[in-house]
Amino acid sequence: MLAIEDVRAYEVLDSRGNPTVKAEVTLSDGSVGAAIVPSGASTGSKEALELRDKDERFGGKGVLKAVANVNESIAGEILGLDAFNQTQLDDTLRELDGTKNYSNLGANATLGVSMAAARAAAAALGMPLYRYLGGANASILPVPMCNIINGGAHANNNVDFQEFMITPFGFTSFKEALRSVCEIYAILKKELANSGHSTALGDEGGFAPNLANNTEPIDLLMTCIKKAGYENRVKIALDVASTEFFKDGKYHMEDKAFSSEDLIERYVELCAKYPICSIEDGLAENDFEGWIKLTEKLGNKIQLVGDDLFVTNEDILREGIIKKMANAVLIKPNQIGTITQTMRTVRLAQRNNYKCVMSHRSGESEDAFIADFAVALNTGQIKTGALARGERTAKYNRLLEIELESDEYLGEKL
């Protein structure tokens, strides 16, 4: 075995200029792993706690408490542990925190250490991270769900839906799929500029124009897909993030108040008109009856993804499976706090034929851990923003590297 010999953390910046935690783990052979923890803007209420300082520094968003928890509390407990026993490490982190949502240490502290330790162990074996975490069966390049028009909490515009994505499923390689997205993205920029719209970018690298309603972005994407020559090879996916505009039992958007039934019918109409393959968080995280109805209505036709609904939590997902809510789960490691817990949620989903989508957060960094993680777990899909901004392209570029070693692209088999 190789023992964990040193652990340290410090404050760095994410893509929004907010502080986040960077952790480094050193093993007894000198191998080092490092990781930067992401941060979300629209968050589910049941997510693991992201510990912030709430003082005068950085408008209260500093993470020195989480950093201190790594350096002072966590380090002393995990030094000497077997670096190759990820489960033991992560279970130790959970026990040390003592809460279900990491409200003592902070999930930004525990996840940083968990990720960094996995990287150090992979480095010690001379293995790529995806192979170390996934073993011999880690081979499938995921279909990217590329968010090229931003709205909601990710943009300063008047569009309610949070993400308008394109999914290049009709290709035999990841690099060709990515090329199609690049070409569509370039055409979209020209279309927006020519029509007098802003080409400013949102948090995730997509364009963030003011548009008439939540349908106009879809029309724009369809125009660009057609001009690029990729009809029937690229579909549309939406992240509605409806919890953000759910209040007093109604969904408030486009200057109207919609019931769950109204919104479901809106989705049915959209799916009949456009090649929509996936809707994420179509209803609010606590609108359970609505979710059951939505799944009954569209669950056999498209992918219905639970993000705020499930928050990458194995126990919550299990309840959702029993109640037949959604048919897919978004996977965000920082929602749950460790690598092991993330893997358990993915395995539960896969055993029950729920699809998985590995996902970034809107506050990201140059760390490309989730690219390897998506391949390791054969999630088959990944969300990591538009093809702009370095914190987004870092993940795409890492997947292009992985494709040189493992060239199976899920594509039409999705």
Curated annotation (Swiss-Prot):
It catalyses: (2R)-2-phosphoglycerate = phosphoenolpyruvate + H2O. Transmembrane segments: none annotated. Mg(2+) binds at D239, E280, D307. Its cofactor is Mg(2+). Pfam families: Enolase_C, Enolase_N. Binds a second Mg(2+) ion via substrate during catalysis. One of its GO terms (cellular component) is extracellular region. SUPFAM superfamilies: Enolase C-terminal domain-like, Enolase N-terminal domain-like. Belongs to the enolase family. This is Enolase. It comes from Campylobacter jejuni subsp. doylei (strain ATCC BAA-1458 / RM4099 / 269.97).
